[in-house]
Amino acid sequence: DRIGFVQRVYDDGSIKSERGNVGNAVIYGIESLVDFNLNELFFKNNDINFNYFINFSLIESEYTKSMEIGVEGKKVEFVPSVNIKTGLKYGYKNFSFNTQLSFISDQYTDSSNANEGNLSGVIGVIPSYKILDISSSYKSKKYGIEIGINNVLNNFYFTRRATGYPGPGIIPSPPRNYYITLELKI
């Protein structure tokens, strides 16, 4: 049994999303993390740390049985088919620099797999998106500092649709933002 959202049409012509037992679903896939220590291949220097990483998942999902009309054979909501995170980590002695690129494929927000949203913004596809983050840090035995930028390319994206407060509607994700972290060891 899979709990999710189903669209209901009422006598007055209105369509509302209701949460309930959608039906039986199968979800399967593969996830992998590969982390290469490039220092071992190229530099052979203990002061340098240079890594490339990639984490990816490929997931298939499908409703196999449902009492709801038009649900069987549809993808399960909030299950992107592709999720990739890749990046480089470079460090020299106490300094480090990190970059990460994330890609999430499109996904549905309801069991009908509606591509187009309605006026409320509650149903519809969540489009695929890419996010680039970078950070740099310095750490010593007594203190550390880290600075970073999330969503460097300032991409517009969203990861969910709200059915209640503060919605209903699309909840946008943050634009480019900056942070700084100070660390003191006592």
Describe the function of each predicted region.
Residues D1, N39, F50, F103-N115, ...:
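C-terminal beta-signal and adjacent terminal beta-strands/loops
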Residues Q7-K16, Y63-I69, T109-G117, F158-T163:
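Flexible, solvent-exposed coil segments and beta strand-coil junctions
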Residues S81-K85, I131-D133, P175-Y179:
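Transmembrane beta-barrel architecture of outer membranes
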Residues L88, I134-S137:
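Short, basic/aromatic-rich helical patch in the C-terminal catalytic core of site-specific tyrosine
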Residues I3-G4, V22, V76, Y157:
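Short clusters of hydrophobic/aromatic residues that line enzyme substrate/ligand-binding pockets
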Residues E18-S112, T181-E183:
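Gram-negative outer-membrane beta-barrel transporters
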Residues I15-V22, E68-K75, N118-G124, Y165-I170:
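Extracellular loop and loop/strand-boundary signature of outer-membrane beta-barrel proteins
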Residues G91-Y92, I126, K139-S140:
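Structural motif
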